[in-house]
């Protein structure tokens, strides 16, 4: 019987299935960070349990680390406690960890693939919503809660119910100026933030196959914003080439065997999906969110929608509340929206290709950050990304134009560290969530691609980067 990619990943990891369909799944890799792991380790200590498979875990601090000068340490006592606690727990249990001043440190969903710890055919979990990122490698990856983090540490398994299969098929050539971020925002705009609820989404079609691994990671990263349990892309030569030579991958004869195995992780011809959604890539234009949910998105050449035209009273009410919070008037051209701050970073868009795309726009415009922009910051996703960008001179492109070049971390994606918006500030952000208060109490977030964020920094408002050529 023909199987989907998700079916293959699920079936190859089932240890036992209960009568109600609940399955015990074997977990190949757990990624840990400082926010959702302390209680899990404390539970192990209280129960006097060991970590079942130490080598299956990889840890890093990312949410609370400062992105400015780290020689002064972490100022906030709660943040410092969380980072110190992860350090102590990893030392006590012998878990591999990249500490704050290690060049390999970075955002957990960037360092996993970067190190080759994320591999095709794996089940991967982390106490973090955007674990779906790793599905780009033909893996089953999703976020879990703190009690589940403890369960995986203790047993290397997890109780789960199988999701339904959804295929999101994007065909055709992506227009100039459009990126993976625009693809996934367009998908969410089409199906909504509940469209993927109860599903695992496979992203397929010629447009997805043409993406680099970094682009695929951006798409899978935001599968959770469409309500899906997981997002994934079939393994192909692009996947294998990306992994070749990375620290955690097999070598020699084991590499050849692994590649042969990995390439089986694709949907069979004739495999049946419970839902299929199709998009024409040629119709996608640069996207900008206008509201307080990723589904509240439109094209750069569009306008802020008018709630009066929405027939559904629930949706109309949500639109009205969002516009009030965002301080936007209906029918305002998106290009007329001015911004106060720019954030280029996060597990969605802080890889080297993202940094290059933003730098290209800054060089093309050849001007400094607009006077009305109070802060424009670029936060690389890892120390290795930062070092690569600096070798290419990209840091100078940004700093000479008035941007701040920071140390790696989650930064302004969420208001959990020193990088945040003040009440009423408006930010063009390359992150994944634009909820109320996500980047700081009263902060207003617009999700865009790195190129769009860079252009907004220079112009002081959103602009259509397709005009840049």
Swiss-Prot record:
Binding of [4Fe-4S] cluster occurs at: 347, 410, 413
Query: What keywords appear on the UniProt entry?
Result: 4Fe-4S, Amino-acid biosynthesis, Branched-chain amino acid biosynthesis, Iron, Iron-sulfur, Leucine biosynthesis, Lyase, Metal-binding
Under Pfam families, the record lists: Aconitase
Q: Tell me the route in metabolism or biology where this protein functions.
A: Amino-acid biosynthesis; L-leucine biosynthesis; L-leucine from 3-methyl-2-oxobutanoate: step 2/4
> For this protein, what reaction is catalysed?
(2R,3S)-3-isopropylmalate = (2S)-2-isopropylmalate
Cofactors (names): [4Fe-4S] cluster
Q: What is its EC number?
A: 4.2.1.33
Molecular function in Gene Ontology: 3-isopropylmalate dehydratase activity; 4 iron, 4 sulfur cluster binding; metal ion binding
According to its UniProt entry, the function of this protein is described as:
Catalyzes the isomerization between 2-isopropylmalate and 3-isopropylmalate, via the formation of 2-isopropylmaleate.
Subunit record text: Heterodimer of LeuC and LeuD.
Designated name of the protein: 3-isopropylmalate dehydratase large subunit
Instruction: Look up and give the organism this protein is from.
Output: Burkholderia pseudomallei (strain K96243)
């Amino acid at each position: 019987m023909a199987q989907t990619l998700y079916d293959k990943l699920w079936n190859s990891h089932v240890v036992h299935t209960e009568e109600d369909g609940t399955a015990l799944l074997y977990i190949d890799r757990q990624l840990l960070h400082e926010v959702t792991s302390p209680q899990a380790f404390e539970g192990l200590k209280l129960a006097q349990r060991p970590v079942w498979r130490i080598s299956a875990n990889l840890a890093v601090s990312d949410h609370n680390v400062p992105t400015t000068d780290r020689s002064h340490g972490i100022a906030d006592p709660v943040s410092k406690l969380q980072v110190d606690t992860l350090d102590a727990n990893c030392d006590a249990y012998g878990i591999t960890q990249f500490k704050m001043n290690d060049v390999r440190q970075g955002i957990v969903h960037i360092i996993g693939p970067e190190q080759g710890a994320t591999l095709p055919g794996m089940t991967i979990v982390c106490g973090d919503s955007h674990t779906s990122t790793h599905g780009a490698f033909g893996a089953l990856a999703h976020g879990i809660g703190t009690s589940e983090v403890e369960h995986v540490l203790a047993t290397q398994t997890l109780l789960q119910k199988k999701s339904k299969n959804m295929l999101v098929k994007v065909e055709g050539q992506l227009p100039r100026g459009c990126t993976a971020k625009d693809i996934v925002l367009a998908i969410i705009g089409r199906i909504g933030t509940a469209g993927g609820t109860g599903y695992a989404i496979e992203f397929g079609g010629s447009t997805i196959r043409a993406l680099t691994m970094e682009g695929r990671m951006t798409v899978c990263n935001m599968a959770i914003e469409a309500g899906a349990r997981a997002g994934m892309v079939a393994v192909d030569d692009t996947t294998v080439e990306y992994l070749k030579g990375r620290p955690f991958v097999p070598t020699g004869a084991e590499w050849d065997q692994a590649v042969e195995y990995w390439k089986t992780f694709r949907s069979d011809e004739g495999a049946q999906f419970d839902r299929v959604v199709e998009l024409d890539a040629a119709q996608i234009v640069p996207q900008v969110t206008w509201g307080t949910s990723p589904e509240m998105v439109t094209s750069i050449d569009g306008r802020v929608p008018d709630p009066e035209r929405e027939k559904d009273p629930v949706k109309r009410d949500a639109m009205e509340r969002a516009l009030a919070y965002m301080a936007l008037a209906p029918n305002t051209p998106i290009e007329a929206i001015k911004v106060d701050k720019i954030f280029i970073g996060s597990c969605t868009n802080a890889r080297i290709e993202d940094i290059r795309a933003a730098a290209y726009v800054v060089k093309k415009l050849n001007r400094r950050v607009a006077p009305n922009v109070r802060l424009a910051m670029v936060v690389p996703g890892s120390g290795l990304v930062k070092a690569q960008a600096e070798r290419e001179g990209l840091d100078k492109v940004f700093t000479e134009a008035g941007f701040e070049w920071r140390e790696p971390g989650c930064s302004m994606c969420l208001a959990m560290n020193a990088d945040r918006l003040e009440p009423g500030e408006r930010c063009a952000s390359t992150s994944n969530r634009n909820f109320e208060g996500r980047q700081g109490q009263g902060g207003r977030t617009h999700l865009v691609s790195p190129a769009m964020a860079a252009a907004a920094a220079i112009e002081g408002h959103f602009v259509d980067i397709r005009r840049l050529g």
